Amino acid sequence: MRILRSEKPLKKRDEIEADESLVLVYQDEVHFQIQTTVTSGWYKKGSAPTVKSFPGRFKTSYSGFVIPESGVLFTAKPEMFNYSTTIDSIRSFINKHPVPDRKKYALVMDNAPWHKKTIRLVEQEALPEYEDIRNSVVFVKLPPYSPDLNPIEQVWRITRRENTHNVFFSSLSLLEETVDSAFGAWAVPNDQLRSLCTFK
């Protein structure tokens, strides 16, 4: 299995898109905190407004995969982020969205430590337990500190802006329902993410 190294990421992206044996996929993880995030508001001059916020530091976590070709978003909900949950999330993705015949997913990932370990184990160990991933995925490593090259970051930004900013959540389950609903709308082919994630 090849590991494509993104020394010139935009050129590499164009090469991947032109390669008929590859289907481009962007992956990333995200936390949504239950604390109220205030981004704007109106209040009288001289007043001292208060903002309701849940008294705790709870969060819900997601591992996301977006296919620019279709705009489809797939999310898994790991309890934590490590190499084991990354492998589980990749498997969940390729089980839900089997790779087309005679193709592989070009899976773009950042340099999180658990991503590095996932790539090392799947590539170097070559154990039978990882064969399904090796048969379906080519890893593409983003340059360090380049979230602007991973458009799934914009998916997280839009989700926060349209669903969680300036909203009080009285329980973690309400936050999860809100985020799950937002992601569910993108679980089928759609123009919004197709446009957002193609760098056109």
What are these language model-derived features?
Residues 1-200:
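Short functional hotspots at interaction and active-site rims
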